[in-house]
Amino acid sequence: MSQPVTVDASIFVNAFSPTEEGSDKSWEYINSLRRDGIPIIVPALVLPEIVAAISKKQNNNSKFGIRLAEEIRNIPNLALIPLDEFLAEQAVSIAATYNLRSTDAIYAAVSIRFGTDLVTLDREQLARLGKIVPVKTPDK
């Protein structure tokens, strides 16, 4: 089994947005993690992030977004990490130091806590977090 990963919501959203560039790579990446049983360690906020983004892309089709969240929640090798006080404090420091959005900093904090690579399509995460956590795209 390979090393666990933290997968940003951008990967899931891209995978389920077939008209977006790289969607096929994101889809294959998620499927390979599932197939190979590689632990996926993500903040629990990944679910509302995905639902919000997909529902918006689907002309406010919230039913599709909710079904998708259920499918993701049922990935057997997925661990949803709640935001506790320590993780929040670490995310505060990361957000302030690296000028990141709060959710991006939370993914970084989860990645640091569990010693995972952070896999993302988010340009700010890719550009700013390499000094504190391994950051990569699904095709690397």
Regions found by a protein language model. Give the residues of each.
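Alpha-helix capping/helix-boundary segments
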Residues: 11, 46, 87, 106-107, ...
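Acidic catalytic patch
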Residues: 18, 44-46, 70-96
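Short beta-strand scaffold positions
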Residues: 7, 41-42, 82, 102, ...
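Short, well-structured N-terminal submotif of metal-dependent ribonuclease cores
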Residues: 1-42, 58-67
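Short, conserved active-site loops that position catalytic residues or coordinate cofactors/metal ions
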Residues: 9, 44-52
